[in-house]
Regions:
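Cleavable N-terminal export/targeting peptides
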Residues: 1-26
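Short glycine/proline- and aromatic-enriched beta-strand/turn motifs that initiate or cap beta-hairpins
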Residues: 19-58, 64, 87, 160, ...
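Short loop/turn motifs that connect adjacent beta-strands in outer-membrane beta-barrel proteins
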Residues: 21-28, 54-55, 92-102, 140-143
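Flexible, solvent-exposed loop segments that connect beta-strands
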Residues: 22-31, 61-83, 111-130
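Transmembrane beta-strands of outer-membrane beta-barrel proteins
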Residues: 29-33, 58-60, 83, 101-107, ...
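Solvent-exposed loop/turn segments connecting transmembrane beta-strands
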Residues: 32-45, 71-75, 124-127, 148-162
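Transmembrane beta-strands of outer-membrane beta-barrel pores
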Residues: 35-41, 62-68, 91, 109-115, ...
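Transmembrane beta-barrel domains of outer membrane proteins
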Residues: 47-49, 88-92, 135-137, 151, ...
């Protein structure tokens, strides 16, 4: 029993002692895709992030959603296309997080193109959005993982869930 406990403890110490900077790293690229949560339909998104420094990344992202609502007794459908950029700081190095995890936070800015019927009486104008996000990724393979991001203050989404591929 003592041997089993020792092996388990050594394994845990080794697992948490092995850490690195952001899995993306400087000059790395990662592709992200998934679905989001929003008050204006369910967005589908795809994005590309670039490692610009050891712990910093810049990215671009596009999203699409179709949103239907009943307003003054009639049904209206809107389409929203978003184009945004983001900047993130990755906390792996300073928090000594294992390299199969990626914890980050940052800011985003984007423009959201609303397409609504001409007779739509509600609000739904194209707009500029500015927001913040905090997120994490878990890489179950060296280059492939899952991502979860929570955000606010913009027209894009309140949260996102998807996949990440580093190349």
């Amino acid at each position: 029993m003592k041997k089993v406990v020792t092996i388990v403890l050594l394994s845990l110490v080794t697992a948490f002692a092995v850490h690195s900077q952001s899995p993306l790293g400087k000059e790395g690229k990662q592709l992200n895709a998934g679905i989001g949560l929003s008050g204006w339909g369910v967005p589908l998104y795809v994005g590309l992030d670039f490692g610009v420094a050891r712990d910093f990344s810049l990215g671009v992202e596009g999203s699409f959603r179709s949103y239907g609502q009943k307003y003054t007794g009639s049904h209206y459908s809107s389409t929203i296309i978003g184009l945004s950029g983001n900047a993130n700081y990755h906390f792996n190095r300073i928090l000594e997080i294992p390299s199969n995890w990626d914890l980050y936070a940052g800011l985003n800015i984007g423009y959201y193109f609303w397409s609504t019927p001409a007779n739509y009486p509600g609000t739904g104008a194209s707009t500029l959005g500015l927001g913040g996000q905090i997120g994490g990724r878990y890489f179950f393979k060296k280059n492939f993982g899952l991502n979860l991001e929570l955000g606010g203050g913009d027209a894009f989404s309140n949260g996102k869930f998807g996949i990440t591929y580093i190349f």
